Curated annotation (Swiss-Prot):
Signal found in the keyword field: yes
Zinc finger residue ranges, RING-type: 128-170
Name of the protein in question: RING-H2 finger protein ATL34
Domain of life (superkingdom): Eukaryota
Catalysed reaction, written as an equation: S-ubiquitinyl-[E2 ubiquitin-conjugating enzyme]-L-cysteine + [acceptor protein]-L-lysine = [E2 ubiquitin-conjugating enzyme]-L-cysteine + N(6)-ubiquitinyl-[acceptor protein]-L-lysine
Annotated transmembrane regions: 47-67
InterPro entries for the chain: RING-H2_zinc_finger, Znf_RING, Znf_RING-CH, Znf_RING/FYVE/PHD
UniProt record similarity statement: Belongs to the RING-type zinc finger family. ATL subfamily.
Basic and acidic residues composition-biased segments: 303-327
PROSITE patterns named among the record's database cross-references: ZF_RING_2
Signal peptide: 1-26
Keywords, ordered alphabetically: Membrane, Metal-binding, Signal, Transferase, Transmembrane, Transmembrane helix, Ubl conjugation pathway, Zinc, Zinc-finger
């Protein structure tokens, strides 16, 4: 029996020794794997830095593009980087001021309203589209030859110092270098209300599409100038009823706004015979602009008398002859 059990015991001893060796080798074997956070941390830091640098670079490029687009775009949405000069030179335009020069403004005809009051075509008074006041005899006007719109000289001079278009019809006013004034501003014959051609209808329709004209047409032109006229505001030059109409436009009982009439535009148009406008374009402008309240801007004693003498000089000249011919 002893001999029969010996192989079994030997087998058990061998298994025990193998397990013991495996256990001892497992206890003495060093750990070579590092914690996950230690192995991943050195690889994540460069990736985060690169991502931040790329985001910063992309944001900087986008900001530069926006700033460049904003600084090189005019208020009307057109690029104002450069413009071609008369001799092929590139001249940089002023981005702060888009108006006309003083010499160009003074080249437009300037005269007293009393000089042409008896020669104008049509009935009713003419008003300045900027201050919305009717012209008086002693006021100095300035005529825009391309569209025949007239304004107070003091009002339109301020407007053209920052803009280069007509306040009513947005016609371009700056002359091209080297061009003749007569060829640049061809005088258009005054339209007849009873026989209006297609060209005038199209031009008037394009004018009515201007937002500024629609705003002005909301005002009522039936105000009678008399003793009951509200006083004008010193800050805006508008009377109280005009400011009320501007803020709260009138409407019909159905709730629809009043449709602007084409005839309202004639309040801003000084319609003169072609010969009169030609003489105004060649006539020298008055040396000093006369205000409706303070006389000439110089403020010196006797300036008002000189203005009346200048008016008399022009009135007794070619304009009086034209009046006699028309009568």
């Amino acid at each position: 029996m002893t001999i029969g059990k010996s192989p079994i015991l030997l087998h058990h001893h061998v298994i025990f020794l193998l397990l013991l060796v495996l256990q001892v080798s497992g206890q003495h074997q060093p750990r070579t794997t590092a914690p996950p956070y230690i192995a991943q941390r050195p690889n994540q830091v460069p990736a985060v830095i690169i991502a931040m640098l790329m985001f910063t670079l992309l944001f900087s490029m986008l900001a530069c593009c926006v700033c460049y687009k904003y600084t090189n775009t005019s208020p009307h949405g057109t690029s104002s980087d450069t413009e071609e000069g008369g001799h092929g030179e590139v001249a940089f335009t002023r981005r702060t001021s888009r108006g006309l020069g003083k010499d160009v403004i003074n080249s437009f005809p300037s005269f007293l309203y009393s000089q042409v009051k008896g020669l104008k075509i049509g009935k009713g008074g003419v008003e300045c589209a900027i201050c919305l006041n009717e012209f008086e005899d002693e006021e100095t006007l300035r005529l825009m030859p391309p569209c025949s719109h007239a304004f107070h000289a003091s009002c339109i001079d301020v407007w053209l110092s920052s803009r280069s278009t007509c306040p009513v019809c947005r016609a371009s006013l700056p002359p091209k270098p080297g061009s003749d004034q007569n060829s640049l501003y061809p005088f258009i014959r005054p339209h007849d209300n009873q026989d209006m051609d297609l060209e005038n209808v199209t031009a008037r329709r394009s004018v009515l599409e201007s937002p500024d004209v629609r705003l002005l047409d909301r005002l009522s032109w039936s105000n009678n100038t008399g003793a009951n006229t509200p006083p004008r505001s010193r800050s805006t030059g508008l009377s109280n009823w005009r400011i009320t109409e501007l803020l709260f436009p009138r409407s019909h009982s159905t709730g629809h706004s009043l449709v602007p009439r084409v005839e309202n535009l004639d309040r801003f148009t000084l319609q003169l015979p072609e010969e009169v406008r030609r003489q105004l374009s060649h006539m020298k402008t008055l040396p000093q602009a006369r205000s409706s309240r303070e006389g000439y801007r110089s403020g010196s004693v006797g300036s008002e008398r000189r203005g009346k003498g200048k008016e008399k000089e022009f009135g007794e000249g070619s304009f009086d002859r034209l009046k006699a011919e028309m009568v």
